[in-house]
């Protein structure tokens, strides 16, 4: 075996060197003919075929077994043995002159045949460089197909000869193909090619070059072309003729005339140059091709050219002998590597990714992997909408926006989504739920929008998943409009009212509106529903031509991003390190006391450090859960001087009290920070410090109460809006200010140990100064650093030096004096002012300060007491100040930081004019466009000028700029003029103008002109003014009332009850002639305003108030219209009534469930502000002024 291995290695080297110079050819045994007999070949004794049933390993004695140089299922057999008993030594590999090509005419009855090399004696002929086509080699050699399979033109001189039935094992780039072409002289249209899975000569068949191992198959996919699958034998079909192909363990295709399958012309791509030899296909023996067995479910076929019509392909299970032939014919690793190297010389793989491809053509066969390729190609060609993608489960680096779409089947939501995703319109009514995704750019950042279209009602999973929900209905379908209201109710019931962060949008689709199906849902009804849904925007879209489609999704995504930022800001405010509210949030309110209700003093309610006691607070909160009597807290009045000095309470008492204070206040705004502080007003005459329970709420308000009991019961409390305030610390520079004198050696401006402060420069500056004890008999106070800096002429510099600067020796002539006390003492009760210029020196100022301290504290002992002052101020925009003092500077800094955070949050929630213009420009444009779209609003109501830009609110009409000046002269009781472009348009004003319009207004105010000519756009101002005054002031053209004799009050009640806006406007116009008797025979003595508020009709409510309805009118139970508006759940009606000075609801609202659940408007200010002007101008009776 070792000698055979040496011969193998040597033969390999020789073969590689002569690879480019030698052309190897295999010639099948020719039919018995005189011409064939003349061309003999040595080794004819080995030409007898072996018995097909004889095993491969059963070799005759004296014959050495052949060893293969290469094996790749179709490798060429090369003898590596020396001459034995039955064989001759193969000749050396030397080039031979090519003989002229000669056509071969096989016998009609003979069929083209290919068989593997038998294990007989070695070939005596060896590897001939150029065997003649008509030669008769020994039958012990395995003939190879030499028919050209590349489809290109054949080389010159090779058109007539060749080996019968030869074919290239490399028909295409990355694929394997067997092609049987008819001979050029007389092709036959139909032939039968039969392939078997094993060698005919034995049960352990050798490998064939027409089938490659699975691990080495490298098919490619390029464009519409596909390549052969792994382990599959493909037979390509040409353009003319066809053939039935039967394969075992592979898939074949019909074969016909030769087609162009490769761009490489005249070049050999096989080991033996057999692809350059044409061969006949008629009368040839059957082809026997060993193939790798593959499952029937994973059969693939490939072709580099579309196939013509062909009969169906028959798949057969692999023969048993094929598997044994594969297993017995495996080559070594070295042989396989060598074969890969040789194959790479003649074939050049494409750059496509490896993978099986589907079979093109009419056969339509594809494997599971081929189906995946087809699916992948279809998805790549489709738009960005992908259904059931893994994007719903995998994490991404870009943020997500989860958007849900709800609506009826006929709402048009599927067409809306399809238009947004693809940009094209398609009538879709999907009865099942779908999922989509698309990338969007929001605030300059890419977001992945996950769209979930729900076919039915939302469930709990959907309500928790969605960041925004779009409710879609069709403007021509009443049922879809009603379904939206039910869907919204179900969503709110699942998600809850209190859970914020959900952006809502209501969309009315115009896709189905036509002459046969007109619009049935008016704009006023849709906007009223949008108002009831709260924090909802209304849009009208048309997916047919894309009106507002992209805008809906863009604005909803923008709203989601804005809400997320606000939630993050609030979460940051709530997670302040100094607020212990989250540590004891689960403690019940009922169990709040401290050892029978006794507390020592103020110091017992404050932790000594904001970082201590969070873990212990949770344990102590459980300890006090069973105690009661919350009203007994702080009953005893304590001396102010002992609040911070005497700490008689234990740590457990302090923590339990602190935990109680943090858990109170259920049912109101979320408290961010709360504790006891000292408070005094800076503007009142009473300068005495009082202990208050101070609470900082998440809505931007600071509340303080005399006791915790008052806070629990919401009595005797004051609050201030932090939007209009700022917080300051006395003697401390503003944040971000950089000191010009270097870093401070003190802690928050207070030097703890003077012995460690460097009092000068140079070598002696590093020596600690001694600290002599204070002398009680002397009135000379210690020259502390605060007093020295405050005595400087520049007050700002003094403030900076007192807090942020390290004192140096040259700042003051007194700076080098040794301090008599180791502790620096700050003033506590009175702010020091800058000394006047008339004062002689700083010593006089110091003497005054000492005398004031002596008078205030009563003794010199208290002057040198180590007592610290931790004060901060809240200053309003009106100049009012509130002084608060904490127990430590850590607590003070925590309060200052929390208040600054809330001020920032309030300012960010409050929209300035520019921000409002940018964010609300599109929504305002929609409102203005809706006003312009009202009937008759394209021209001026008085002169007919086109495109009016001004409006009269109480008339409900649009006017031009020339007529607007005349309307202003009439007075606001007749005409309230507003610009469409320059003024803001609240929701209620937009509803009024869209509900009336110029057409309705002229039918009321200009019904009978009495032959008078109406002015035109070219009329003079005098003509316009005369017409306008006659029309609105003198009521000359007013439409008459009906023939009914009912009082105007009853007619107005009936019109309000019928919600007839035009009739209400006409009756209100006639009521100007005299007082309007609104008394009706109503058992509850309600007025039309009560009825309008009960019906939640915003337009009629606004018109009644403009035309003089009594906003303070009460019914039999003493309830005003505000009660009915809140009972109906109409926030807009309630806002309108409050703007016109409507008093409280009146009566008892506890018996009305809807009124009890309706949020109060005046009790707790809303944390969200629509505009800065509205926030600064609001009036609240609970705001503290002192």
UniProtKB/Swiss-Prot annotation:
PROSITE patterns reported for this sequence: ANK_REP_REGION (PS50297), ANK_REPEAT (PS50088), ARFGAP (PS50115), GLD (PS52057), PH_DOMAIN (PS50003)
Record keywords, A-Z: ANK repeat, Cytoplasm, GTP-binding, GTPase activation, Metal-binding, Nucleotide-binding, Nucleus, Phosphoprotein, Repeat, Zinc, Zinc-finger
GO molecular function: ATP binding; GTP binding; GTPase activator activity; GTPase activity; ionotropic glutamate receptor binding; phosphatidylinositol 3-kinase regulator activity; protein kinase activator activity; protein kinase binding
Outcome (variant: residue 687 to N): Abolishes phospholipid binding and nuclear localization
Segments of skewed composition (Pro residues): 92-106, 308-320
Occurrences of domain Arf-GAP (ranges): 925-1045
Region (G domain): 399-566
Zn-finger (C4-type) residues: 940-963
Subunit structure: Interacts with EPB41L1, PLCG1, NF2, HOMER1 and HOMER2.
Protein's name in the database: Arf-GAP with GTPase, ANK repeat and PH domain-containing protein 2
Species the sequence originates in: Rattus norvegicus (Rat)
């Amino acid at each position: 075996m070792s000698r055979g291995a040496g011969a193998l290695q040597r033969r390999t080297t020789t073969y590689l060197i002569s690879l480019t110079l030698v052309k190897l050819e295999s010639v099948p045994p020719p039919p018995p003919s005189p011409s064939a007999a003349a061309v003999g070949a040595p080794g004819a004794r080995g030409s007898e075929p072996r018995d097909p049933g004889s095993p491969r390993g059963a070799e005759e004695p004296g014959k050495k077994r052949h060893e293969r140089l290469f094996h790749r299922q179709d490798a060429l057999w090369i003898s590596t043995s020396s001459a034995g008993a039955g064989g001759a030594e193969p000749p050396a590999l030397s080039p031979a002159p090519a003989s002229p090509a000669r056509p071969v005419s096989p016998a009609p009855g003979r069929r083209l045949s290919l068989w593997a090399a038998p294990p007989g004696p070695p070939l005596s002929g060896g590897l001939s460089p150029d065997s003649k086509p008509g030669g008769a080699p020994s039958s012990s050699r395995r003939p190879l197909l030499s028919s050209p399979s590349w489809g290109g033109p054949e080389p010159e001189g090779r058109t007539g000869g060749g080996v019968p039935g030869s074919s290239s094992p490399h028909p295409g780039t990355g694929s394997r193909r067997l092609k049987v072409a008819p001979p050029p002289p007389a092709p036959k249209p139909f032939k039968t090619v039969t392939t078997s899975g094993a060698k005919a000569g034995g049960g352990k068949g050798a490998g064939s070059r027409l089938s490659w191992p699975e691990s080495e198959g490298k098919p490619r996919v390029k464009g519409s072309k596909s390549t052969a699958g792994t382990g599959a034998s493909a037979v390509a079909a040409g353009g003319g003729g066809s053939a039935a192909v039967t394969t075992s363990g592979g898939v074949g295709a019909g074969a016909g005339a030769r087609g162009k399958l490769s761009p490489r012309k005249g070049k050999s791509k096989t080991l033996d140059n057999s692809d350059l030899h044409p061969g006949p296909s008629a009368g040839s023996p059957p082809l026997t091709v060993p193939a790798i067995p593959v499952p029937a479910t994973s059969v693939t076929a490939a072709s580099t050219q579309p196939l013509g019509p062909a009969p169906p392909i028959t798949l057969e299970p692999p023969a048993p002998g094929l598997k044994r032939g594969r297993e017995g014919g495996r080559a070594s690793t070295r042989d396989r590597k060598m074969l890969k190297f040789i194959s790479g010389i003649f074939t050049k793989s494409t750059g496509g990714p490896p993978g099986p491809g589907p079979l093109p053509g009419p056969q339509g066969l594809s494997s599971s992997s081929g189906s995946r390729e087809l699916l992948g190609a279809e998805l790549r060609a489709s738009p960005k909408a992908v259904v059931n993608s893994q994007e719903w489960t995998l994490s991404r680096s870009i943020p997500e926006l989860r958007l849900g779409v709800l609506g009826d089947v006929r709402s048009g939501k599927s067409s809306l989504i399809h238009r947004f995703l693809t940009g094209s319109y398609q009538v879709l009514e999907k009865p099942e739920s779908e999922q989509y995704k698309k990338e969007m750019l929001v605030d300059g950042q890419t977001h992945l929008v996950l769209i979930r279209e729900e076919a039915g009602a939302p469930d709990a999973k959907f309500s928790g998943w969605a960041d925004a929900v779009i409710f879609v209905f069709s403007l021509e379908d009443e049922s879809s409009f009603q379904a939206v209201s039910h869907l919204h109710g179900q969503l709110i019931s699942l998600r809850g009212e209190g859970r914020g962060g959900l952006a809502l949008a209501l969309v009315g689709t115009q896709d189905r509106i036509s002459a046969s199906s007109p619009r049935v849902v008016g704009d006023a009804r849709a906007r009223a529903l949008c108002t009831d849904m709260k924090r909802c925007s209304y849009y009208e879209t048309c997916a047919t031509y894309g009106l507002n489609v992209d805008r809906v999704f863009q604005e909803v995504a923008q709203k989601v991003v804005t809400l997320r930022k606000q939630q993050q800001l609030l979460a940051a405010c709530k997670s302040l390190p100094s607020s212990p509210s989250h540590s004891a949030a689960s403690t019940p309110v009922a169990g709040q006391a401290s050892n029978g209700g006794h507390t020592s003093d103020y110091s017992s309610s404050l932790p000594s450090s904001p970082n201590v006691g969070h873990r212990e607070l949770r344990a102590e909160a459980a300890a006090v859960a069973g105690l009661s009597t919350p009203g007994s807290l702080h009953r005893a009045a304590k001396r102010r001087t002992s609040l911070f000095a005497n700490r008689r309470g234990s740590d457990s008492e302090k923590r339990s009290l602190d935990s109680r204070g943090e858990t109170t206040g259920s049912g109101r705004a979320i408290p961010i920070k709360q504790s006891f502080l000292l408070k005094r007003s800076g503007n009142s005459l009473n300068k005495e410090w009082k202990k208050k329970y101070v609470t900082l709420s998440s809505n931007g308000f600071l509340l303080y109460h005399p006791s915790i009991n008052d806070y629990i019961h919401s009595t005797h409390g004051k609050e201030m809006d932090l939007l209009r305030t700022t917080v300051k610390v006395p003697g401390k520079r503003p944040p971000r200010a950089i000191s010009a004198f270097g870093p401070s050696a003190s802690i928050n401006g207070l030097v703890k140990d003077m012995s460690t402060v460097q009092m000068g420069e140079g070598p002696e500056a590093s020596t600690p100064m001694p600290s002599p004890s204070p002398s009680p008999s002397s009135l000379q106070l210690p020259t502390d650093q605060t007093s020295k800096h405050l005595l400087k002429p520049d007050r700002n510099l003094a403030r900076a030096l007192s807090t942020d600067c390290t004192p140096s020796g040259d700042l003051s002539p007194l700076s080098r004096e040794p301090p008599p006390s180791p502790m620096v003492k700050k003033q506590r009760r009175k702010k020091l002012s800058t000394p006047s210029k008339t004062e002689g020196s700083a010593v006089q100022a110091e003497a005054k300060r000492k005398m004031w301290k002596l008078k205030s504290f009563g003794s010199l002992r208290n002057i040198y007491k180590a007592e610290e002052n931790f004060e901060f101020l809240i200053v309003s925009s009106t100049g009012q100040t509130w002084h608060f003092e904490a127990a430590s500077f850590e607590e003070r800094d925590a309060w200052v930081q929390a208040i600054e955070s809330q001020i920032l949050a309030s300012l960010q929630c409050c929209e300035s004019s520019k921000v409002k213009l940018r964010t609300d420009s599109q929504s305002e444009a929609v409102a203005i466009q809706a006003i312009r779209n009202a009937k008759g609003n394209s021209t001026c109501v008085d002169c007919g000028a086109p495109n009016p830009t001004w409006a009269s609110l109480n008339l409900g009409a649009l006017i031009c700029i020339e007529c607007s000046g005349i309307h202003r002269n009439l007075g606001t009781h007749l005409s309230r003029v507003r610009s469409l472009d320059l003024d803001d348009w609240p929701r209620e004003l937009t509803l009024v103008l869209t509900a009336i319009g110029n057409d309705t207004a002229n039918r009321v105010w200009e019904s009978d002109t009495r032959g008078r000519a109406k002015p035109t756009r070219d009329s003079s101002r005098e003509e316009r003014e005369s017409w306008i005054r006659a029309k609105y002031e003198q009521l000359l053209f007013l439409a008459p009332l009906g023939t009914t004799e009912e009082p105007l009050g009853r007619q107005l009640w009936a019109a309000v009850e019928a919600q007839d806006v035009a009739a209400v406007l006409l009756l209100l116009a006639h009521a100007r002639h005299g007082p309007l008797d609104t008394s009706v025979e109503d058992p509850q003595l309600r007025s039309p305003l009560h009825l309008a508020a009960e019906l939640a009709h915003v337009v009629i409510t606004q018109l009644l108030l403009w035309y003089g309805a009594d906003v303070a009118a009460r019914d039999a139970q003493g309830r005003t219209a505000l009660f009915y508006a809140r009972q109906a759940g109409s926030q807009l009606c309630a806002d309108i009534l409050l703007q016109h000075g409507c008093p409280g609801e009146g009566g008892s609202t506890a018996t009305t469930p809807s009124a009890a659940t309706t949020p109060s408007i005046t009790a707790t200010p809303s944390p969200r502000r629509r505009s800065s002007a509205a926030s600064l101008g609001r009036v609240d009776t609970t705001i503290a002024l002192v």
